[in-house]
């Protein structure tokens, strides 16, 4: 937890917050802080700054906060990802938030197991929890947008063209693929398939709306590794 995220209900006055639960436990056990110490804090979807500890005990943490810093800008990248298995989804959500991706779309595919869509990890609360962990790691306050698309063909034909406007668009797939570009600075969209990849029909449909196939290398990667490699290549170094 490199940043303590503050939510509206934490504020007891304009510049004062009271924290309990996980954040209190982290400050006690990891930071081992004391009254008079300062901690890095940020208001969710707002400014960042410091929090001066004015009270700290087993029941609560009270901070006087000074929020003056703008959070780091999001990368103008949309990741369209075939819904992975739930345990992998948790890690990918954290990664997306940590790396500053603007938007994540979780989409269905022929090789996505139907049971994945009934997972409790797809609830709004569960998704938000993992995104918060990613923001805490990166020292960011702004949540990425996450949307679900349970029907592949309607998403590609009706929704995807609008997302592609003004963006370079890539499909991570080895068929007739060029090398994945690196350190891109403009708006982009990248599509990554499920374990086993998209079926030929899905690849053709994605190509028909303007996606260019790119290769992430000769090795067969797990989905979360493919996400890390693709974003690592596409996002600018600075």
Q: Where would I find each of the regions flagged by the language model?
A:
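N-terminal positively charged helical leader segments and presequences
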Residues: 1-69
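Short, ordered loop/turn segments at secondary-structure junctions
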Residues: 9, 68, 108-111, 218
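Hydrophobic side chains in well-ordered alpha-helices
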Residues: 27, 89-92, 202
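Short secondary-structure boundary segments
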Residues: 43, 108-109, 173-176, 194, ...
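RNA substrate-binding interface of SAM-dependent RNA methyltransferases
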Residues: 70-168
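Active-site/ligand-binding-proximal alpha/beta "capping" segment
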Residues: 160-203, 211-214
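Structured adenosyl-cofactor binding patch, chiefly the S-adenosyl-L-methionine
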Residues: 200-238
């Amino acid at each position: 937890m490199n940043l303590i995220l503050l939510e509206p209900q934490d504020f007891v006055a304009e510049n004062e917050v009271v924290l309990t639960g996980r954040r209190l436990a982290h400050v006690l056990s990891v930071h081992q802080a004391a009254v008079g110490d300062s901690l890095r804090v940020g208001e969710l979807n707002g400014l960042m700054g410091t929090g001066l500890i004015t009270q700290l005990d087993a029941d609560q943490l009270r901070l006087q906060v000074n929020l003056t810093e703008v959070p780091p800008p999001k990368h103008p990248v949309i990741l369209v990802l075939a819904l992975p298995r739930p345990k992998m989804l948790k890690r990918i959500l954290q990664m997306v938030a940590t790396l500053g991706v603007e938007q994540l779309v979780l989409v269905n595919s022929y090789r996505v197991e139907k049971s994945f869509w009934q997972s409790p990890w797809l609830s709004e609360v569960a998704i938000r929890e993992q995104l918060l962990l990613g923001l805490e790691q990166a020292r960011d306050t702004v949540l990425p947008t996450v949307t679900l698309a349970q029907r592949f063909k309607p998403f590609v034909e009706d929704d995807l063209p609008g997302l592609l406007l003004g963006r370079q668009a890539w499909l991570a797939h080895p068929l007739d693929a060029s090398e994945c570009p690196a350190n891109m600075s403009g708006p982009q969209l990248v599509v990554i398939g499920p374990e086993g990849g998209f079926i030929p029909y899905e690849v053709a449909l994605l190509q028909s709306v303007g996606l260019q196939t790119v290769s992430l290398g000769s090795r067969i990667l797990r989905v979360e590794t493919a996400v890390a490699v693709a974003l690592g290549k596409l996002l600018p170094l600075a």
